[in-house]
């Protein structure tokens, strides 16, 4: 005798699929951990959308705080090469580390300003979006306020002279040592 359980559960499964996958889903822009600073003075580094949206048409929306104007930028979500992290270690050894940066850079921003960033990605018939994430650019420092110390001044001249004298003494010592060795 065949069970009627699969036939009875099919409508329930279809209803759950319709309710749980309405066509618009949310994803979060990653927390940007592992990066020294995602913010620069006139640009921001933003994590790419998740891997399941590869090939989708992404719209990055940037809104300045206390402003209603939204600047949009469209691009195709690039394919994933391994896990999608903002910064991933590609190779490490012998005292060096090679990393790959998987981010979208928003440029031409105002220094020291707060922005709200969000994505909307359309892939096929479904559209997914991220909530607005606040990010701020770094303030621009006045050039005169940056302490240079002895950069490009007497310190460099002194080091260059000391190294030149030491090199001269090494060459003279090598010539004298070779000359004495040839006498014996």
Swiss-Prot record:
Cellular compartment(s): Cell membrane
Keywords: Cell membrane, Cleavage on pair of basic residues, Glycoprotein, Membrane, Signal, Transmembrane, Transmembrane helix
Gene responsible for this protein: Upk2
Propeptide boundaries: 26-84
Family matches, as InterPro entries: Uroplakin-2 (IPR009952)
Transmembrane segments: 156-180
Membrane topology: Single-pass type I membrane protein
Family: Belongs to the uroplakin-2 family.
Residues with attached carbohydrate: 28, 57, 66
Function field: Component of the asymmetric unit membrane (AUM); a highly specialized biomembrane elaborated by terminally differentiated urothelial cells. May play an important role in regulating the assembly of the AUM.
Keyword Transmembrane part of the UniProt annotation: yes
UniProt topological domain (Cytoplasmic) ranges: 181-184
Domain of life: Eukaryota
GO cellular component: apical plasma membrane; apical plasma membrane urothelial plaque
Lumenal-side segments: 85-155
Keyword Transmembrane helix among record annotations: yes
Name of this protein: Uroplakin-2
Organismal lineage: Eukaryota, Metazoa, Chordata, Craniata, Vertebrata
Cleavable signal peptide: 1-25
Assembly, per entry: Interacts with uroplakin-1a (UPK1A).
């Amino acid at each position: 005798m065949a069970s009627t359980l699969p036939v009875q559960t099919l409508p329930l499964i279809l209803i759950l699929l319709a309710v749980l996958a309405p066509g618009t889903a949310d994803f979060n822009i990653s927390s940007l951990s592992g990066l020294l600073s995602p913010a620069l003075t006139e640009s921001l580094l933003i994590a790419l959308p998740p891997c399941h949206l590869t090939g989708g048409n992404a719209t990055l929306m940037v809104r300045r705080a206390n402003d209603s104007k939204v600047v949009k930028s469209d691009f195709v979500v690039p394919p994933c090469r391994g896990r999608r992290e903002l910064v991933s270690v590609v190779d490490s050894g012998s005292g060096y580390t090679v990393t790959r940066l998987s981010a979208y850079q928003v440029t031409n921003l105002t220094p020291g300003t707060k922005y709200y960033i969000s994505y909307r990605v359309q892939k096929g018939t479904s559209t997914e979006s991220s909530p607005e994430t606040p990010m701020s650019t770094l303030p621009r420092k006045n050039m005169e306020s940056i302490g240079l110390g002895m950069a490009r001044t007497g310190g460099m001249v002194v080091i260059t002279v000391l190294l030149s004298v030491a090199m001269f003494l090494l060459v003279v010592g090598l010539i004298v040592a070779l000359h004495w060795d040839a006498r014996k």
